[in-house]
């Protein structure tokens, strides 16, 4: 995750509520890390109202679609009784992947606020620009780099600890062999 980087942004269009929702997502991501999940979390909100929040749950549910964005949109849609999330915003700690970016468009999400860019799978700015692709039937307003340093450090710490644990397990196997 050393390639994670800060997005240069003026934060024009980012409101105080967006920062508060990102702080909430960061808190959820920390909890996910404690549960062995990659620390990514998302909050779906309309104005000041939180409609849904979720963290990655791929490991817990053995579900390849258990990304925070997908889970949060599913919960928001159920709460609203509607799959369209028009007028809603999402704060997510990492730039969405192609699957999640496509789901944002399909859900007609109004705005996306994300923290760190994703050099390996980022589909909003880094590798692709799915949410603002004029060829699609909906475009999502995007603001990247919100509290990016905190989001990056959370991911780096998680993977640093994971690598150390994997190395310790390998070393233990070598000693017992």
What do these predicted regions represent?
Residues 94-101, 106:
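Conserved redox-active cysteine motifs that mediate thiol-disulfide chemistry
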Residues 40-48:
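Short beta-strand scaffold segments in enzyme catalytic cores
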Residues 1-32, 103-177:
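Zinc-dependent deaminase
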Residues 17, 38-40:
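Short loop/turn microsegments at loop-to-beta-strand junctions
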Residues 82-95:
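Immediate flanking context of iron-sulfur cluster ligation sites
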């Amino acid at each position: 995750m050393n390639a994670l980087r800060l997005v240069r942004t003026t934060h024009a269009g980012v409101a105080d509520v967006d920062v508060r929702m990102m702080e909430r997502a960061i808190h959820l991501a920390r909890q996910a890390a404690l549960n062995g999940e990659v620390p990514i979390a998302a909050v779906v909100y309309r104005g000041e109202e939180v409609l849904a929040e979720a963290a990655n749950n791929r490991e817990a549910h053995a579900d390849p679609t258990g990304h925070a964005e997908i889970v949060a949109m599913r919960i928001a849609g159920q709460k609203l009784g509607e799959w369209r999330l028009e007028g809603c915003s999402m704060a997510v700690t990492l730039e969405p992947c192609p699957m999640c970016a496509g789901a944002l468009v399909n859900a007609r999400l109004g705005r996306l606020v994300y923290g760190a860019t994703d050099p390996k799978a980022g589909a909003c700015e880094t590798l692709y620009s799915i949410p603002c692709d004029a060829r699609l039937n909906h475009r999502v307003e995007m603001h990247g780099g919100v509290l990016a340093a905190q989001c990056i450090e959370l991911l780096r710490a998680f993977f640093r600890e994971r690598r150390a644990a994997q190395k310790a397990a390998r070393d233990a196997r070598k000693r017992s062999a």
